[in-house]
A protein has these predicted regions:
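ATPase catalytic-site recognition across NTP-hydrolyzing enzymes
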Residues: 1-59
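Acidic two-metal-ion nuclease catalytic site recognized across multiple nuclease folds
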Residues: 9-14, 20, 243-264
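Gly/Thr-rich phosphate-binding beta-strand-loop-beta motif of the actin/hexokinase/Hsp70
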Residues: 51-75
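Short, conserved catalytic/metal-binding motifs centered on acidic residues
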Residues: 61, 124, 238
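Short, glycine-/Ser/Thr-/acidic-enriched flexible segments
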Residues: 64-65, 74-76, 127-129, 193
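Mg2+-dependent endonuclease catalytic cores in nucleic-acid-processing enzymes, primarily RNase H-like
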Residues: 82-224, 249, 262
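Short, flexible active-site recognition loops that position polar ligands and cofactors
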Residues: 221-233
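Glycine-rich phosphate-binding/hydrolytic loop that grips phosphoryl groups
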Residues: 235-243
Length: 264
């Protein structure tokens, strides 16, 4: 944790210690963090891998029962010696808390970042052009995200990726990036992405007449204690959009909401 962390400063309180030295009582003032209070502080100020000078890259997955947001930055990896997509965090809202609440949670978490860089690259595909089941209202999902982010003071570069990439292309690109053999490499903050990592590890593959694809059959099942919504494939879909967006669309025209073509 950095020494000048604002969250630590906010949770630090003055206390008094009393001891006896040479037969005399000595009272000393000292400052110490309230660690119970620190546990409640959930913002990006505690993230050591966040680069304050760089923009954020963001993608969502939209569903009736669970909505996901996955956030990253692109910068040089010490491990690979080249640029990598650093997956900083993932978060979700479930059941009665929908997409708008998720964007609000995301803003609360990343609000301190706006002091240094308020630019967000928001990647979305045709799945974001639906409405209804992930929100209360009749706006497209992408419009809700853009509206909320701008309301909170973010400069949004909305990048329309068009139709989702083919499963074979996503599978190949992501596996090669995870293996460190193709750009952009992937590095994941394990503490901030626990559910996402488990979901990625649990994701299976279905093989049909159109080739192989991600097995998303569990998304239709009722949530149970041993099979919670956050450990299913929904979060991995948001991760896929983020990765493919960074790989193929990162250098699109800033601020232009136009569908782009996949670069084969």
């Amino acid at each position: 944790m950095p020494e000048d962390c604002p969250a630590v400063e906010d949770a630090t309180h003055l206390k008094i210690a009393s001891t006896v030295i040479g037969g005399q009582q000595v009272v000393t003032d000292y400052a110490t963090p309230d660690f119970n209070e620190l546990q409640k502080v959930k913002t990006c100020r505690l993230d050591g891998d966040l680069r304050p000078e760089l923009p954020l890259h963001l993608a969502f997955d939209y569903n009736a029962n669970i909505n996901w947001a996955v956030t990253g930055q692109v910068f040089r990896s010490e491990k690979y010696g080249r640029d990598a997509l650093h997956v900083l965090s993932s978060m979700f809202t479930k059941n009665e808390r929908k997409l708008r609440e998720l964007v609000q949670d995301w803003n609360t978490y990343y609000a301190p970042h706006k002091a240094n860089n308020r630019v967000v690259y928001y990647y979305y595909d045709t799945t974001a052009k639906h409405k209804g089941y992930a929100i209360s209202g009749q706006q497209d999902f992408k419009d809700i995200v853009i509206e909320e982010l701008r309301r909170f003071g973010w400069e949004v570069n909305a990048i329309d990726m068009g139709r989702p990439a083919e499963h074979e292309l996503k599978h190949k690109d992501i596996n090669e990036a995870l293996a460190g053999v193709s750009y952009p490499f992937i590095q994941i903050n394990t503490e901030n992405n626990e559910a996402l990592i488990v979901a990625m590890e649990n994701t299976g593959v279905q093989i049909g007449r159109d080739g192989f694809r991600k097995d998303k059959s569990k998304e239709k099942y009722i949530e149970t204690e041993v099979d919670p919504l956050e450990l299913r494939t929904d979060g991995t879909d948001a991760f896929d959009v983020l990765f493919m967006g960074v790989k193929y669309f990162q250098h699109s025209m800033d601020g232009i909401c136009l569908p782009m073509r996949w670069k084969k």
